[in-house]
Amino acid sequence: MRMQAALVGWACTTLCLASCSSAFSHGASTVACDDMQPKHIQAQPQHQDSHHITIHTHRTSYAPGDKIPVTVRSSRDFMGFLLQARRVSDHQIAGTFVLIPPHSKLMTCFQEADAVTHSDKSLKRNLSFVWKAPAQPVGDIKFLLSVVQSYFVYWARIESSVVSQQTHSSAHSDDRMEPRLLMPNLHQRLGDVEGAAPAPRTPITLPQQHTHVFAVALPGAAEEDNLDPVPASIWVTKFPGDAETLSQPSSHTATEGSINQQPSGDSNPTLEPSLEVHRLERLVALKRVSSESFASSLSTHHRTQDDPSFDSLETCLSSDGGEQDKTKASNRTVTQPPLSTVQLTYPQCLWSSETFTGNGVRASNPIPVLQTSGTSGLPAAGDQSEASRASASFLPQSKHKELRAGKGNGEGGVGYPRQTNPRPDIGLEGAQAPLGIQLRTPQLGILLCLSATLGMALAAGLRYLHTQYCHQQTEVSFSEPASDAVARSNSGETVHVRKIGENSFVLVQAEYNWITPSVGSKKTVL
């Protein structure tokens, strides 16, 4: 009877262990979704500070619908795990997992694929997941992980760093807009600006990109315009229709110079939302003053388009009649407060991508040059009407020459400045080259002499060795008149000499066997 009871108890224990082992090897149960505790053992979890597992989130903030990569790294192998994303506010499960590693499967705790667990008991160490945020805002979240290293060793609810939700203001913190500068498009007419000026718009949000522009001054520009360097960090505001506007990131004001631009029918006029009335009045006054100059530039532009000889250079010439009007308009310009005033206007003339330099030589790929400067006073009316010209201008320049407005007589012409050569002087390098060669000549001569001496010594040594060991002499003395004679050379070789005439001998080198005759005389047998 006792034997049967023991067998029944053993069978029940085996079945319980098998069921628990099966549940452990095929993943966590849905019962563990709430507290994330393994249900197959009753042991206490390990201390949170003793675990060797880290949860890395590749982003610190997210927006609704974003996908966040999550990586679980461990210095030791483990078999089971349960991963969830929970809200920091109420600890509710949030989001779904869209990508899971091998040997794992998705779970459904409160919604489909909102948790991940293991699918087998294979050893695991590094796992990668992709979590997708819900479409509705849920606030800041954390990733919680429970890991089972062995049957009795596990860690529950290991937390990751907080992933904050992006708000509307923080999402656009890098693209905040500070429009403070009225800047028409490069190809925009002043008449279009005048027509759109009386209708101010409501404040709108425009994306901006922060850029750093290097200030490059043309030769002689500092003497002509009395330019002062200012910070070249500006904002580029993008408007609809691929239009861009430059503005200063701080609260700097801008003054407009005399603008003479080419017309373009595909450019839409754009105005800054924060526009003062007096700036509009000044812009309209500048338009009226430069109307004749604009007409002259327009006629010149059409003339150069019709004439194929001027298809690569657009010349912008201002008329003589508008010279005094420009001077008066510049004198009527309202003085701004001394707040590090910045002038950012556009150039008076725009050249095409190819210009003629020299005697018809075509120079392509012009480089735009930006000038930034600050002026604190009004330009004086003198011999030049271009004293109030733009201090920040994009001027195309070729590889060898630069084009800038001509001087004198108050007439805005196009001139060719002196040629600048950024490369070092080649003549100086050529003058220094023979000096280096002269310094190295004695060393080269000494090296050649030593080489010749060594070669001669080597040749003499080889000749001596050849004489000693290669040329062997054999001396034979014929003291007795005999037809045949045997002699031994100085090298120990035995030779046979045969007399074939009165003064003729034949030297034969051979091997001989000496035979002692019975008579007492020696005879050589060949």
Swiss-Prot record:
UniProt region (Disordered), positions on chain = 242-272, 294-336, 370-398
Instruction: List the ranges whose topology is Cytoplasmic.
Output: 463-526
Q: Which residues lie on this side of the membrane: Extracellular?
A: 24-443
For this protein, the record's InterPro entries field holds: Ferric-chelate_Red/DefProt, Reeler_dom, Reeler_sf
> What's a GO cellular component annotated to this UniProt protein?
membrane
Ranges for domain Reelin come to: 24-179
**Where does the protein end up?**
Membrane
Question: Is Membrane included in the keywords of this UniProt record?
Answer: yes
Extract the signal peptide range: 1-23
Record Gene3D superfamilies = Reeler domain (2.60.40.4060)
**Keyword Transmembrane helix among UniProt keywords:** yes
Instruction: Name the major location.
Output: membrane
Q: Where is the composition biased (Polar residues)?
A: 245-271, 385-396
* Mode of membrane association: Single-pass membrane protein
Keywords per UniProt: Membrane, Signal, Transmembrane, Transmembrane helix
**Membrane-crossing residues?**
444-462
Q: Which domain of life is it from?
A: Eukaryota
Spell out the protein name for this chain. Reelin domain-containing protein 1
